[in-house]
């Protein structure tokens, strides 16, 4: 049986919910409910509202996803 391909998207965390769950506003305008992946949980990476993240979505349910990476904030040079 072939494994289904996941949909990778980027977005911004807009709300932090209980149990390591977040509401993310994707670049295409959708809002999805996400949880964090095991590697992020294991390495104690903090995710806060306003952070830019990469999200994996299942093709079966596009309203739920998994945060796989927290993108670095752009540094401003003075």
UniProtKB/Swiss-Prot annotation:
GO terms for cellular component: chloroplast. Keywords: Chloroplast, Initiation factor, Plastid, Protein biosynthesis, RNA-binding, rRNA-binding. Belongs to the IF-1 family. One of the essential components for the initiation of protein synthesis. Stabilizes the binding of IF-2 and IF-3 on the 30S subunit to which N-formylmethionyl-tRNA(fMet) subsequently binds. Helps modulate mRNA selection, yielding the 30S pre-initiation complex (PIC). Upon addition of the 50S ribosomal subunit IF-1, IF-2 and IF-3 are released leaving the mature 70S translation initiation complex. Residues 1-72 form the S1-like domain. Its main location: plastid. InterPro entries: NA-bd_OB-fold (IPR012340), RNA-binding_domain_S1_IF1 (IPR006196), S1_domain (IPR003029), TIF_IF1 (IPR004368). It is found in: Plastid, Chloroplast. Component of the 30S ribosomal translation pre-initiation complex which assembles on the 30S ribosome in the order IF-2 and IF-3, IF-1 and N-formylmethionyl-tRNA(fMet); mRNA recruitment can occur at any time during PIC assembly. One of its GO terms (molecular function) is ribosome binding. This is Translation initiation factor IF-1, chloroplastic. It holds the Pfam family eIF-1a. The gene is infA.
């Amino acid at each position: 049986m072939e494994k289904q391909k996941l949909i990778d998207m980027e977005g911004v965390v807009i709300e932090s919910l209980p149990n390591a769950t977040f509401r993310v506003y994707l670049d295409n305008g959708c809002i999805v409910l996400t949880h964090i992946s095991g590697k992020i949980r294991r390495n104690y990476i903090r995710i806060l509202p306003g952070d830019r993240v990469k999200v994996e979505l299942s093709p079966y349910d596009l309203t739920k996803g998994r945060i796989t990476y927290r993108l670095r904030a752009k540094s401003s040079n003075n």
